[in-house]
Amino acid sequence: MSDQHNNNFEIQEDKPPKSKSTLGQSIFNFCNVLLNIYGVGTLSLPLAFKHAGWIIGISLLFFCMGVTNYTARLLIKCLNYKEGIYTYPDIELIAIAISLVILIGDSLQILFPDISLISLKIIAWMILIPLALIDIKYLSYFSLLGILSAIILVIVVIIDGITRNEQPGSLFNPMKTELWPTDWNSLPFSFGLIIAGYAGHSVFPSIYLDMQTPNTYLKAINISYSFSTVVYLLIAVCGYLMFGNMTKPEVRLNYAFKNGF
């Protein structure tokens, strides 16, 4: 493989010219993919720590970050290896879109329990379709809203934890937690929950091809992964401390069914 493929991420010359995303806009898009699209399992990270314990849970988080960061780099090298390669196969993108509609619909049902699940999925589909037709450069503004939502989510959990003194739900009076897994058979379950938050690779080629300066791809990826990991750690650690072995599949469910929340 040439030095260009080994050391640089140069955009292919045969791509149609158009207005591109800046480094900042690309970082917004990367972070939004990790935190809010494929990272919809962010609220499940406390459950992952519940099954894995502190030591293995934190180790798995950094391991998954490192592996997926590295494979994100390899992905673009593969993209540039041969001309005419732009995205994942269409069939895979369709499958991902369907799974996203299902995930969003399930999440919205918690906020709107009186609306049927099918109706919520239809609403999610109607929202996603127009967004899919917008140029990625302009989607970066929507990505910023998604990032702010993730930050607000963490802030709300932390504030609630420090303002409560009784269990469960208090950071100053935490629930019982474990250093090591209490059931080793559930460890693969934790691995799946954690790595899901870093699996945004199917969208990365599209964001990369839209960058004004594709040679800054590594910088954008490193910043995005570092920021996302900080958010993941905060929600996982705080959620596990607050609810311990009572942690539900999504930490917000602990709030939904707890008096006073």
Predicted regions and their residues:
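Central hydrophobic cores of alpha-helical transmembrane segments in multi-pass inner-membrane proteins
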Residues: 40, 65-74, 124-133
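Hydrophobic alpha-helical transmembrane segments
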Residues: 30-31, 55-59, 118-123
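Membrane-interfacial loop- and helix-cap regions that link adjacent transmembrane helices
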Residues: 2-13, 18-22, 27, 73, ...
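Membrane-water interface regions at transmembrane-helix termini and the short interhelical loops
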Residues: 46-51, 107-111, 124-146, 210
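Alpha-helical transmembrane segments of multi-pass membrane proteins, especially transporters
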Residues: 32, 60-61, 65, 220, ...
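Residue-level signal for short hydrophobic patches within transmembrane helices
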Residues: 26-34, 38, 42-45, 59
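Extracellular loop-to-transmembrane helix junctions
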Residues: 46-85
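Residue-level recognition of membrane-helix boundary sites in multi-pass small-molecule transporters
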Residues: 56-57, 138, 216-219
